[in-house]
């Protein structure tokens, strides 16, 4: 019963908290310059943790019983492994010497924990003294070790979130232990309460006193404040940092009154990883269909879905909580949304055994065409030196090591889960949403929303014999994975036909290593090989189709911008046409702007910039998701430039690290790159003034609502009411002491009575567009369900997947759902009318309308004879010509 609470607090982390059990052998790190990797012992399948889950999966019990056991035992892996080390148990193939060293280390740590608790240095966590020290160690290491590997940007590690997570888990473990003890005592008290024997009366009195103490401790524990929980997490994290050689909690001063705190590996981390089943997970794929979510007539959740333990104990809500937009946590649901969640979670998957076998062969060449590692299979050999490298924040080894280790943790987790699931007949992914109604699949590395490795290892359980449509879709997807998605479909099909003999020669490493996505290309090649050998071949591979500049697709449809719609593939096109590429089409305008800017003496060097698609794509793509000029500047600098020198008289200078963008001997000032960022940012709005008009309208609406002290509310096309209200936060300091060392915490507290104007404006457009993404999926799922069509379906926000034979149907459903959202010119007017209603509901007669029923202004009493007047922006008038919606169904590249 205790263990299930481990899962509760992964929710605050991004969806990339990947996980499973894996154990490395103790061979030396292999030279990564060598093109071949030894993979036989990469993941030991006889480790204690691995076998714990594997034995449950392979047992003769019912699937429901096995699923329940998996959920319970999964969260105890770290404790199991540490207990095994303490008892000097180990799995075959593990490092005997290292295991003995670790046993001694852990015995010492237990003494440190006991001393820490006995001296009252528990940072005000009532009840923690009742927990086993080995459990406390397992909780801390189970969070800190993966954390130290996971985050590739070491200078932006969310350490406060880590401390909060550890503190919360310790809190709830203490609560469980107290409930357990209270239950035992109550049972005994009930047994002896009526006895008059002196000995039993004495026992009764002692037990009731202890019971009162436990209940009082429990009350204090349940009322523990957020900052106290963070202090607890920091305390135990710092203690193990001071007393172990696994990791180090460091603090670095970066400016006056400003410092960063980060966690880095220490000397014995590799030994630990080589002798333990590393866990970093919320859940594994389910071997039974996830339980359904259910709501009542008031649109409140009455039955939790997903995992069995989630259904029983309500651990994780359907909607992930938002700290910044806290009011969203109380928003209601609706039937259409909940039905869509239940539909998506019922799609069964299996492991692509051919891919799993291929990538774990001894002879697997683990390098792509650019000599980049495809799968990261070992911790970076210089990880223990990271602390030394951190003395110089500019040292490129920092990024090299942290990026490597982050990918290592991710890839290892994916392959470990695949190995666990490879013999499972079928498995499922739980589905959750955020407050905008956007869908997220399972907090597990192996899911359809994961990276290329995860997607290459997943197959739909229900396969089909390929028909003509399916074979064509598979060939196009193969070409896409190779990197030909910017060509016409006709050209892609021709390329596959011309190279088919090479593609299906699976042992021909050269062709798939040339692909942009080599593992997905390999998965496609295996399907084509199967069909080529037998036309009755049953295909299971999910075919992914990606929307083109999806944010701009939505915005262009809102304002009926025919020119922009054409550039983002909303209009009629054929298989002989190339898909339009907005990013490339903006380049001539940007070049012209740079040419004009370079006529100024201080910006002469800008003419040395070669404007490539890669330079502008990310900035243009993220404008609709809230990117600012400064944000684009940060993107460009981080990817293409490095600091050259700091001269206080002339400012910050950079050199380009990509010779395709600029010569490496040309020095650019910060002003140069800021101007370049401004040109990129403004290019979209200068070319498409309707887009600028829409952005100005949305921003002005949000500004007025902030002045009126109102959140932004809107209704999705399927009827869900969404509210955005970002609070202001105030910072305050807290101090705690661990092992005579002082730790200062800078914490934030939300002022729920105030609204952050800056955050409201910056976040609204991306949040609004994301809610339309989610709406598109809800509408298409409900259409599929209502029509009774049996179709495998998965989605990654604006990317859609189905069986090859069903791609034409899915494309049609996606387009139809998009048309339903924007099919008439009243979309923005409906949005405006709802805003008016919200204002009128609060201000009543102080909200003033014109003769046409349009809200013009609000008057606010300021204590004088003349009230304040706040003008309301007029509704945005858009072109009523619906040519866009007439053509979407005939677009070959709406999703590509």
Curated annotation (Swiss-Prot):
Catalytic activity, EC: 2.7.7.6
One GO-annotated biological process of the protein: mitochondrial transcription
Source superkingdom: Eukaryota
Entry's Gene Ontology molecular function annotations: DNA-directed RNA polymerase activity; mitochondrial promoter sequence-specific DNA binding
Keywords: DNA-directed RNA polymerase, Mitochondrion, Nucleotidyltransferase, Plasmid, Transcription, Transferase
Subcellular location: Mitochondrion
Reactions performed catalytically: RNA(n) + a ribonucleoside 5'-triphosphate = RNA(n+1) + diphosphate
The keyword tRNA processing appears for this protein: no
Active site: 546, 617, 798
Main location: mitochondrion
PROSITE patterns: RNA_POL_PHAGE_1, RNA_POL_PHAGE_2
One Pfam family matching this protein: RNA_pol
GO CC annotations, alphabetized: mitochondrial DNA-directed RNA polymerase complex
Role noted for this protein: DNA-dependent RNA polymerase catalyzes the transcription of DNA into RNA using the four ribonucleoside triphosphates as substrates.
Family the UniProt entry places it in: Belongs to the phage and mitochondrial RNA polymerase family.
Protein name (database record): Probable DNA-directed RNA polymerase
């Amino acid at each position: 019963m205790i263990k299930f609470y481990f899962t509760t607090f992964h929710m605050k982390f991004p969806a990339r908290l990947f996980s499973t059990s894996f154990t490395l052998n103790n061979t030396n790190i292999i030279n990564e310059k060598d093109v071949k990797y030894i993979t036989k012992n990469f993941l030991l399948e006889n480790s204690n943790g691995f076998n714990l889950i594997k034995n449950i999966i392979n047992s003769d019990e019912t699937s429901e019983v096995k699923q329940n056991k998996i959920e319970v035992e999964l969260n105890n892996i770290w404790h199991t492994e540490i207990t095994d080390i303490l008892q000097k148990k180990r799995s075959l193939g593990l490092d005997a010497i290292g295991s003995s060293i670790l046993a001694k280390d852990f015995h010492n740590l237990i003494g440190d924990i006991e001393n820490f608790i006995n001296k009252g240095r528990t940072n005000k966590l009532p009840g923690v003294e009742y927990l086993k020290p080995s459990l406390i160690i397992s909780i801390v290491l189970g969070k800190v070790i993966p954390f130290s590997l996971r985050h590739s940007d070491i200078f932006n590690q969310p350490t406060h979130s880590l401390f909060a997570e550890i503190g919360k888990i310790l809190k709830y473990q203490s609560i469980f232990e107290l409930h357990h003890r209270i239950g035992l005592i109550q049972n005994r008290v009930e047994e002896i309460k009526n006895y008059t024997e002196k000995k039993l009366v004495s026992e009764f009195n002692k037990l009731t006193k202890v019971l009162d103490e436990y209940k009082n401790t429990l009350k204090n524990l349940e009322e523990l404040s957020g900052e106290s929980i963070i202090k607890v997490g920091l305390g135990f994290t710092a203690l193990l940092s001071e007393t172990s050689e696994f990791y180090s909690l460091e603090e670095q001063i970066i400016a006056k009154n400003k410092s960063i705190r980060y966690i880095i590996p220490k000397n014995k981390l590799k030994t630990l990883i080589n002798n333990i089943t590393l866990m970093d997970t919320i859940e594994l794929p389910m071997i039974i269909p996830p339980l359904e979510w259910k709501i009542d007539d008031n649109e409140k959740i009455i039955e939790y879905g997903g995992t069995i333990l989630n259904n029983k104990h309500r651990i994780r809500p359907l909607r992930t909580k938002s700290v910044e937009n806290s009011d969203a946590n109380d928003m209601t649901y609706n039937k259409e949304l909940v039905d869509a969640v239940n539909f998506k979670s019922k799609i069964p998957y299996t492991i692509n055994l051919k891919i799993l076998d291929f990538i774990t062969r001894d002879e697997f060449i683990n390098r792509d065409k650019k000599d980049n590692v495809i799968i990261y299979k070992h911790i970076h050999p210089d990880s223990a030196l990271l602390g030394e490298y951190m003395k110089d924040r500019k040292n490129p080894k920092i990024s090299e090591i942290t990026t490597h280790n982050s990918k290592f943790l991710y890839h290892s987790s994916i392959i470990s889960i695949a190995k666990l699931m490879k013999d499972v007949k079928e498995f499922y992914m739980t589905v959750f949403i955020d407050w905008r109604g956007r869908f997220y699949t399972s907090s597990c590395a192996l899911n359809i929303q994961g990276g290329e490795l995860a997607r290459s290892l997943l197959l739909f359980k229900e396969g089909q014999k390929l028909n003509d449509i399916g074979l064509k879709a598979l060939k196009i997807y193969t070409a896409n994975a190779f990197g030909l998605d910017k060509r016409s479909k006709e050209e892609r099909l021709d390329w596959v036909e011309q190279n088919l003999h090479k593609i299906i020669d699976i042992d021909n490493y050269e062709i798939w290593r040339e692909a942009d996505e080599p593992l997905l290309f390999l998965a496609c090649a295996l399907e084509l090989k199967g069909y080529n050998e037998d036309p009755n071949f049953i295909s299971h591979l999910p075919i992914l189709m990606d929307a083109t500049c999806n944010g701009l697709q939505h915005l262009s449809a809102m304002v009926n911008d025919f020119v922009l719609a054409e550039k983002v593939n909303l209009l009629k096109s054929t298989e002989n046409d190339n898909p339009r590429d907005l990013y490339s089409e903006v380049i001539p305008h940007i070049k012209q702007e740079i040419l004009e800017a370079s006529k100024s003496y201080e910006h002469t060097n800008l003419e040395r910039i070669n404007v490539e698609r890669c330079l502008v794509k990310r900035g243009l793509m993220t404008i609709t998701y809230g990117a600012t000029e400064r944000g684009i500047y940060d993107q460009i600098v981080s990817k293409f430039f490095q600091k050259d020198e700091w001269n206080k008289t002339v400012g910050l200078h950079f050199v380009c690290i990509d010779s395709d963008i600029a010569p490496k001997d040309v020095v650019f000032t910060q002003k140069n790159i800021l101007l370049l960022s401004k040109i990129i940012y403004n290019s979209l709005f200068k070319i498409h003034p309707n887009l600028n008009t829409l952005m100005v309208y949305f921003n002005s609406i949000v500004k007025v609502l902030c002045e009126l002290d109102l959140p932004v509310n809107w209704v999705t096309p399927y009827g869900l009411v969404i509210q955005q209200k970002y609070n202001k936060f105030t910072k305050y300091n807290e101090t705690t002491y661990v092992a005579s060392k002082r730790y200062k915490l800078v914490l934030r507290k939300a002022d729920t009575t105030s609204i952050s104007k800056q955050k409201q404006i910056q976040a609204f457009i991306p949040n609004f567009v994301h809610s339309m993404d989610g709406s598109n999926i809800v509408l298409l799922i409900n259409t599929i369900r209502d029509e009774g069509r049996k179709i495998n379906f998965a989605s990654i926000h604006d990317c859609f997947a189905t069986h090859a034979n069903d791609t034409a149907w899915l494309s049609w459903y996606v387009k139809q759902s998009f048309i339903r959202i924007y099919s008439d010119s009243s979309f923005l007017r409906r949005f405006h009318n709802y805003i008016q209603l919200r204002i009128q509901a609060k201000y009543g007669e102080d909200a003033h309308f014109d003769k046409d029923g349009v809200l013009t202004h609000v008057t606010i009493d300021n204590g004088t004879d003349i009230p304040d007047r706040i003008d309301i922006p007029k509704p945005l008038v858009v072109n009523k010509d619906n040519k866009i919606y007439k053509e979407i169904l005939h677009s070959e590249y709406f999703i590509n």
